[in-house]
């Protein structure tokens, strides 16, 4: 019964909102988690009240971000159930998400980025692919899901830009720069055919399995070369943070950065001005004669 409700909600979200599969999978995991917790008290999603849901969402010891995400999924479910006539009320209406402290992204310096980008061995097909992937992610600020989801048709090497498919399947055009375009072009003509060995594949970045690389493989690629470059605590998303912060440091208008990142809300982008200011304060503290 619970699975049926969740399946129907996700189908509606896919048809009406065109949410991508990663988002839908996240909703499923959160709703199944809440359903399991409710079942321990003999309740179900269909008949839970506000107190039941509060107990299932606000669990001691769980990260607030996880609680907020689960509550968001529940709110979508009960809005849909009320609209479909499955329930006459919405028990999540008065439930508030927990306050979450903003995590300031760790800044990767331009010197560290240079070391990272220099790490792959471009004399090998895998190394040339990895070099192109790293260059592209730093040059464009793509989310890892956007980068691994690229087809070559999304890349215009002559104009030096890509068309990224972001959250909610929204398209945006992002400049990729000459250096990134050079390495993507070399990878496409030299390394990609060697990796595919005559097989066809729509994905731009391919693996030795002759299919598009996964998010997990992209994560491993970043971690491997970060280790070689002596950089700790880095992930594919760190390249997106570095891209945005370095642009802000060099004076690019925040709204332009917002468009390039695909942020719907400027407030989301403003975190990078704070990161840049923290970096600037550190530089002044280190080099100013009065510090």
UniProtKB/Swiss-Prot annotation:
Domain Core-binding (CB): 1-82
GO cellular component, one term: cytoplasm
UniProtKB keywords: Cell cycle, Cell division, Chromosome partition, Cytoplasm, DNA integration, DNA recombination, DNA-binding
InterPro entries, per database record: CB, DNA_brk_join_enz, Integrase-like_cat_sf, Integrase_catalytic, Integrase_recombinase_N, Integrase_SAM-like_N, Recomb_XerD, Tyrosine_recombinase_XerC/XerD
Domain annotation Tyr recombinase: ranges: 103-285
Cross-referenced Gene3D superfamilies: 1.10.150.130, Intergrase catalytic core (1.10.443.10)
Family as reported in the entry's similarity comment: Belongs to the 'phage' integrase family. XerD subfamily.
Quaternary structure note: Forms a cyclic heterotetrameric complex composed of two molecules of XerC and two molecules of XerD.
Function (record text): Site-specific tyrosine recombinase, which acts by catalyzing the cutting and rejoining of the recombining DNA molecules. The XerC-XerD complex is essential to convert dimers of the bacterial chromosome into monomers to permit their segregation at cell division. It also contributes to the segregational stability of plasmids.
UniProt name for this protein: Tyrosine recombinase XerD
Organism: Neisseria meningitidis serogroup A / serotype 4A (strain DSM 15465 / Z2491)
Native organism taxonomy: Bacteria, Pseudomonadati, Pseudomonadota, Betaproteobacteria, Neisseriales
